[in-house]
């Protein structure tokens, strides 16, 4: 169901079993192809090198006046040409860095090679190259897959409740009450959105911002004793920290050798979003925050409390989006185009997910969530409409700054589904996937 269709339809939880989902997907789509996986690794590294070579060639391109095809007769033309070439480099290299993140994400799910150590070693280096702690993120991300859309247990983008904003009870709250707390100028909204896109990743890594609030203050992804991790994961956390220190050292010595400006231009600007061009350059970290936020933050998608949550319901509470069109498929490895399939089959290689999506759409039917909205507008829409949820209710939707939810639960149909669900003990589906979800 597309966004507009969901808006006009009361919500009914999917009356679907895990067996129905699994039976719809041919087993060959779940198999790894090491040669094909190797191709994608080589391809992404090659594109990174190609874009880096392009960056090194910018001044030569200007001196040659674009190979003689575009004479530059004035100083302003040279400056404009230089600015456009650098922006092109930052955009494409940013996509390349984002492809490293998405490949490491697949390695974290053990989807590309049969050998666990091969997956972990390659994922470790791909993530370290873009200053991401592989084993730490792998641990919290796999926990997210086991508990997706659970208000009590999910790891990421857990909605704020009414009490967080100190709003009056809904029975006596007025529109003015909501606007006093939640309304803001467009400039302030864009400023907060820009902050989330630029530094949201590091806020999550260092302070657990936008993460589960069941963890104590000081929770982060760098301490092996963080509440996020089990004792057997601590060695991996230390190794992740060593990888970050190693990459940081490489960048430090590169700045000593080639200058800080060179490291900024060739590495850090593709790594983060920068000010005035943020609308056109959601690179690396901005892309990562954008795609992960939009997977699970939408006014028409539910969150569940424990009495109504099941693993199947949580996995279905995600959204497929055509983020960046062909560029998203090529560089981001289907992570947004086929995110629903990824949550149902996180152990399947990304290159088979388009086919898996086709298979499960026939089972999910109206419970398959898709949004054809331009992803940049969808980001703004979710950021401004997904404000808070109520403290009560087993199935809840985000409310906007007016205290209104985009959808309501079809209570009459929910009772019928609940009787069938409890009879089949649907909540046990969580247990089946807690193993395969890695």
Residue ranges of model-derived segments:
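Membrane-embedded alpha-helical segments that form the functional core of polytopic membrane enzymes
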Residues: 66-67, 71-103, 121-135, 322, ...
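Topogenic membrane-insertion module of multi-pass membrane proteins
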Residues: 1-92
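Intrinsically disordered, low-complexity domain-flanking/linker segments in eukaryotic proteins
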Residues: 59-80, 171, 326-327, 418, ...
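Post-HEXXH active-site segment of zinc metalloproteases
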Residues: 61, 113-129, 157-161, 354-359
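Transit-peptide-like, low-complexity N-terminal presequences
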Residues: 1-29, 371-438
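Acidic (Asp/Glu-rich) catalytic motifs at the cytosolic membrane interface
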Residues: 97-116, 137-151, 295-298, 336-347
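C-terminal, well-structured subdomains that either form a transmembrane helix-short loop-helix hairpin
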Residues: 329-363
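Hydrophobic transmembrane alpha-helical segments that form the core helix bundle
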Residues: 156-322, 422
């Amino acid at each position: 169901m597309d966004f507009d269709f969901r808006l006009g339809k009361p919500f009914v939880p999917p009356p679907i079993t895990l067996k129905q989902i699994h039976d719809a997907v041919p087993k060959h789509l779940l198999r790894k192809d090491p040669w094909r996986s190797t191709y994608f690794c080589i391809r992404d590294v090659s594109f990174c090198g190609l874009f880096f070579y392009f960056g090194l060639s910018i001044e030569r391109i200007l001196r040659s006046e674009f190979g003689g095809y575009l004479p530059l007769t004035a100083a302003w033309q040279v400056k404009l040409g230089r600015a456009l070439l650098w922006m092109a480099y930052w955009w494409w290299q940013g996509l390349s860095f984002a492809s490293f993140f998405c490949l490491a994400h697949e390695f974290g799910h053990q989807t590309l090679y049969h050998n666990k150590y091969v997956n972990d070693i390659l994922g470790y280096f791909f993530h370290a190259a873009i200053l991401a702690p592989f084993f730490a993120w792998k641990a919290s991300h796999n926990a997210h897959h086991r508990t997706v859309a659970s208000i009590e247990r999910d790891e990421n983008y857990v909605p704020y409740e009414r009490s967080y904003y100190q709003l009056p009870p809904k029975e006596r709250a007025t529109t003015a009450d909501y606007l006093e707390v939640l309304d803001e100028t467009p400039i302030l909204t864009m400023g907060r959105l820009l902050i989330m896109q630029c530094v949201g990743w590091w806020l999550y890594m260092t302070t657990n911002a936008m993460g589960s609030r069941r963890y104590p203050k000081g929770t982060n992804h760098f301490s092996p004793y963080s509440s996020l991790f089990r004792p057997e994961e601590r060695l991996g956390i230390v190794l992740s920290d060593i990888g970050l220190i190693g990459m940081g050292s490489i960048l430090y010595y590169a700045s000593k050798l080639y200058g800080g400006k060179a490291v900024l231009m060739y590495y850090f600007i593709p790594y983060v979003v920068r000010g005035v061009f943020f609308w056109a350059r959601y690179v690396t970290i901005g892309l990562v925050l954008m795609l992960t936020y939009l997977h699970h933050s939408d006014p028409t998608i539910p969150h569940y409390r424990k009495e109504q949550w099941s693993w199947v319901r949580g996995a279905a509470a995600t959204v497929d989006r055509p983020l960046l069109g062909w560029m998203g498929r090529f560089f981001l490895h289907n992570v947004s185009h086929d995110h629903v399939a990824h949550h149902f089959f996180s152990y399947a290689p990304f290159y088979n997910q388009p086919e898996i999506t086709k298979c499960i759409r026939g089972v999910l039917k109206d419970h398959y969530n898709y949004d054809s909205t331009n992803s940049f507008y969808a980001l703004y829409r979710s950021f401004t409409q997904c404000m808070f949820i109520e403290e009560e209710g087993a199935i809840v939707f985000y409310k906007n700054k007016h205290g209104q939810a985009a959808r309501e639960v079809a209570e009459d149909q929910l009772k019928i589904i609940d009787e069938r669900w409890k009879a089949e003990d649907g909540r046990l589906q969580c247990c089946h996937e807690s193993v395969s979800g890695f």
